[in-house]
Amino acid sequence: MGTVLSLSPSYRKATLFEDGAATVGHYTAVQNSKNAKDKNLKRHSIISVLPWKRIVAVSAKKKNSKKVQPNSSYQNNITHLNNENLKKSLSCANLSTFAQPPPAQPPAPPASQLSGSQTGGSSSVKKAPHPAVTSAGTPKRVIVQASTSELLRCLGEFLCRRCYRLKHLSPTDPVLWLRSVDRSLLLQGWQDQGFITPANVVFLYMLCRDVISSEVGSDHELQAVLLTCLYLSYSYMGNEISYPLKPFLVESCKEAFWDRCLSVINLMSSKMLQINADPHYFTQVFSDLKNESGQEDKKRLLLGLDR
């Protein structure tokens, strides 16, 4: 009888199972190692991404700060310029409150010239009168006011003093002559408004002061010369192109009238231009005319004291 070798199938199955188990375990270990590597890679990628985001955020903040800084500096510059402009405008508005420096004095001549001129008997150095200057360094402003009737009264008093030979002349007589001519031209339609105004009376006074002589011997002669000056005042200061001669004529001969006109023009042409071009000269003549009334009061006071 032969020997029978029996092989248990469970052993084989166990071996296969063990092998299978070993194989699956090995596969599981390999998969676990791969998963561990993937996890490590994911961790590294996450770790590397977080600092990058922070860097990007920080750099963005820096860029924003750099962009904001020029705007803030620009606003600061604008504010500074506005303050400077405000200060300049305030300083310009307050210029009148500041005192201007006095004008520079001309250099004095050498001592040798002064001594030489003094030894010759008279000094050649003369001090020019200085105009009145205020604290601000500008010439003093003079304001003179007077009505037409007041200036006409002053003109009549001046003519009475100038023509001392005319004993019966009243200060109102020249005023009546002037107003009669002005009214006649208004009624005839040669002018729309009266010519007798303060400025025109000042112009007439300037002419009469240099033209009318103290040697006038009659009222008729004074009236002829006064109306000649009035005609030139109308021609120079009036609004119309021309005026009729009849209201200004006293004598029948027109040649005598035109001769007087030419003599007055030759004598007073420069002053007639100056009184319109120079306001200071006009103010001076205005003041002189207004002071004529004060001179009459002084004269009456002296006559009363003499009596």
UniProtKB/Swiss-Prot annotation:
Effect ascribed to mutating residue 138 to A: Increased susceptibility to calpain
Post-translational modification note: The p35 form is proteolytically cleaved by calpain, giving rise to the p25 form. P35 has a 5 to 10 fold shorter half-life compared to p25. The conversion results in deregulation of the CDK5 kinase: p25/CDK5 kinase displays an increased and altered tau phosphorylation in comparison to the p35/CDK5 kinase in vivo.
Amino acid composition bias (Pro residues), ranges on this chain: 100-110
Biological process according to GO: axon guidance; axonal fasciculation; brain development; cerebellum development; ephrin receptor signaling pathway; G protein-coupled acetylcholine receptor signaling pathway; G1 to G0 transition involved in cell differentiation; hippocampus development
Pfam family, one: CDK5_activator
Protein purpose: p35 is a neuron specific activator of CDK5. The complex p35/CDK5 is required for neurite outgrowth and cortical lamination. Involved in dendritic spine morphogenesis by mediating the EFNA1-EPHA4 signaling. Activator of TPKII. The complex p35/CDK5 participates in the regulation of the circadian clock by modulating the function of CLOCK protein: phosphorylates CLOCK at 'Thr-451' and 'Thr-461' and regulates the transcriptional activity of the CLOCK-BMAL1 heterodimer in association with altered stability and subcellular distribution.
Protein name: Cyclin-dependent kinase 5 activator 1
Organism: Homo sapiens (Human)
Lineage summary: Eukaryota, Metazoa, Chordata, Craniata, Vertebrata
Gene: CDK5R1
